[in-house]
UniProtKB/Swiss-Prot annotation:
Motif stretch (Cell attachment site): 78-80
Name of the protein described by the UniProt record: Protein Tat
Organism ancestry: Viruses, Riboviria, Pararnavirae, Artverviricota, Revtraviricetes
Binding site for Zn(2+) 1: C22, H33, C34, C37
Region of interest: Core: 38-48
Other notes: This truncated variant has a premature stop codon. It may have arose as a consequence of tissue culture passaging. HIV-1 lineages are divided in three main groups, M (for Major), O (for Outlier), and N (for New, or Non-M, Non-O). The vast majority of strains found worldwide belong to the group M. Group O seems to be endemic to and largely confined to Cameroon and neighboring countries in West Central Africa, where these viruses represent a small minority of HIV-1 strains. The group N is represented by a limited number of isolates from Cameroonian persons. The group M is further subdivided in 9 clades or subtypes (A to D, F to H, J and K).
Amino acid sequence: MDPVDPNIEPWNHPGSQPKTACNRCHCKKCCYHCQVCFITKGLGISYGRKKRRQRRRPSQGGQTHQDPIPKQPSSQPRGDPTGPKE
């Protein structure tokens, strides 16, 4: 272990911070970039607020972009159409 200089704050010690900034990549190398990356990317733990997805509202023109479901013919009863044999 290297000796720790008591005159330097702990967050300024050499090796306390990675040389490159964190990014949004989730590859294996970036997941082990630093402790924060490992927790958020590697383990998937996030304590931030979850973004609520807005529902898409139908347009005010009254038209929906969906075709109506066509009526399907009633199905034929299964089995012998002449009825049960005795």
